[in-house]
Regions:
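Amphipathic alpha-helical segments of the small helical/lid subdomains adjacent to P-loop NTPase cores
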Residues: 1-34
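Accessory nucleic acid-recognition modules appended to NTPase machines
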Residues: 39-203
Length: 211
């Protein structure tokens, strides 16, 4: 990607015809993600097969073997639970009940999912950085296709009940890819801003809409 051209592209005002041409590709990305082999697959069936193979070899086999994870079924339960609640603030008590993991084991397994580039964590924005670390995070998936493989749902975006979560997950992943920390903001009365980006000393709030 040539840097100067990319900067020009970022400053372009997208016209409606361009947006309409782009939308089908965006919707497909929200369902199948961006793994190269998946993106290059010609049909939906082929994309789904490749994603299932990635899940079965990378997650179900390699990660568990390399890290020598005991009681691996609990990790599978955890990733399923996280996939079903992307964009929601983590409730550790609920996750413990679902997975059978205690609080310490939960944190350990969530760290593993981050370090193996499966999930990413969104911390609550706070001016006191120490406070950020002790508050409950949200969890997203770096690749939407991997997440949809976990929950076994490849329906088109237009037919999805979790459309808002798919868009929010896309935004979280792109923010992370651009080198920013992924954070959200929430008041005690539960008013919320989806993302807060700290850029060159400025704080930029971002709200994701699905309509």
């Amino acid at each position: 990607k040539e840097p100067a051209l990319y900067e020009i592209y970022l400053k372009r005002k997208l016209t409606k015809p361009v947006i309409l041409r782009f939308l089908p590709h965006f919707s497909e990305f929200c369902i199948y993600g961006g793994y190269p082999r998946v993106a290059l697959s010609a049909t939906r069936e082929e994309k789904e097969t490749v994603l299932k193979n990635i899940y079965n070899t990378y997650f179900l086999k390699e990660i568990k073997e390399i890290l020598n994870i005991q009681e691996d079924y609990k990790l599978s339960k955890l990733i399923n639970a996280l996939a079903l609640q992307i964009g929601n603030v983590i409730n550790y008590n609920e996750l413990s009940a679902i997975t059978g993991l205690n609080h310490g084991d939960l944190l350990n397994k969530m760290n593993i999912l981050e370090k193996t580039f499966i999930c990413l964590r969104s911390l609550p924005f706070h001016t006191n950085k120490r406070t950020e670390l002790v508050k409950a995070p949200k969890m997203f998936f770096l690749d939407a296709g991997f997440r949809n493989t976990v929950i076994k749902n490849f329906q088109p975006v237009s037919q999805r009940q979790d459309k808002g979560a798919l868009y929010e997950n896309f935004a979280a992943s792109e923010i992370c890819k651009k080198g920013f920390d992924v954070k959200y903001w929430r008041t005690k009365s539960k008013a919320e801003v989806d993302f807060v980006i700290e850029k060159r000393g400025a704080v930029v709030p971002e709200e994701i809409k699905s309509h």
